[in-house]
């Protein structure tokens, strides 16, 4: 295992924007808590990149949702899986941490385990084995050494289902509780010129390009219907930069011009 005289090498694999946010927080926490330097490699997005990760490829290559979107990009996704496995095996990190997105990250973990069984593999964010397909928990033991859970009941669920050892590490929203409670909506309302005494519709198309492509049409139909009935005059859409253009184009003909907000706005 890694000695303290050389950097700890952690290979991280995220599969979408939420995983990128979790990975970035994990990187910051490890850098703050460990008494040795840390080197990161693997797959991530802008937030992980800002903390020193040079991703093997853009996260948008694999951040897709829905069977049709997956089928259209399947050759690229498969090639990215194998490229990630090849990189991990070649680099021989001290640990691999897969982050959520089990359809993508678990495919990578299984192949790393087959090719290089000595590399420890940690799964950050438990699949919802307690809700459906519980047999996954026991199968995970073949390629996951430890699970870091966001929900407090998940360690016991894994124990009962025969899954890997599991530790509750907390949910990111809990870490931001004080910030959430301190939020003052007035500055944003004033900046967007919102009428506080009127209903505000928040539209949530997600961060994946495939989600935006699939959802904006029914969202637009809903907004038109609500507007025609006099129920909606103000719309807010949280966006991430790489899908902002798609959302702007999709909402250009809406009867209500939505306010697009990014980050912690």
Model region roles, listed by residue range:
Residues 36, 45, 197-198, 210-265:
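Donor-nucleotide binding loops and adjacent catalytic segments primarily
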Residues 8-190, 204-212, 240-242, 261-262:
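Active-site and donor-binding regions of nucleotide-sugar-utilizing enzymes
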Residues 7-9, 195-202, 234:
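Charged active-site motifs of nucleotide-sugar-dependent glycosyltransferases
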Residues 162-163, 193-195, 255:
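Glycine-centered helix-boundary capping/hinge motifs
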């Amino acid at each position: 295992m890694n000695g303290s005289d050389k950097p700890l090498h952690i290979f991280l694999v995220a599969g979408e924007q939420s995983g990128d946010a979790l990975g970035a927080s994990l990187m910051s926490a490890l850098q703050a808590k460990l008494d040795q330097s840390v080197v990161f490699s693997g797959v991530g997005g802008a937030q992980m990149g800002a903390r020193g990760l040079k991703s093997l490829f853009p996260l948008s290559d694999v951040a897709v949702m829905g069977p049709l979107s997956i089928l259209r990009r399947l050759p690229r996704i498969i090639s990215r899986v194998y490229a990630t496995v090849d990189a991990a095996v070649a680099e021989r990190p001290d640990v691999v941490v897969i982050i959520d997105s089990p359809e993508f990250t678990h495919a990578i973990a299984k192949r790393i385990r087959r090719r290089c069984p000595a590399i420890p593999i940690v799964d950050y964010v438990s699949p919802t084995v307690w809700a459906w397909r519980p047999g996954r928990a026991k199968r995970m033991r073949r390629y996951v050494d430890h699970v870091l859970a966001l929900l407090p009941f998940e360690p016991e669920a894994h124990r009962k289902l025969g899954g890997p050892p599991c530790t509750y590490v907390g949910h990111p929203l809990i870490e931001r509780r004080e910030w959430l409670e301190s939020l003052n909506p007035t500055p944003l309302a004033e900046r967007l010129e919102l009428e506080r005494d009127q209903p505000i519709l928040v539209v949530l198309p997600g961060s994946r390009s495939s989600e935006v492509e699939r959802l904006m049409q029914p969202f637009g139909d809903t907004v038109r219907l609500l507007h025609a009935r006099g129920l909606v005059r103000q719309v807010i859409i949280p966006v991430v930069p790489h899908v902002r253009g798609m959302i702007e184009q999709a909402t250009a003909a809406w009867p209500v011009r939505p306010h697009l907000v990014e980050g912690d706005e």
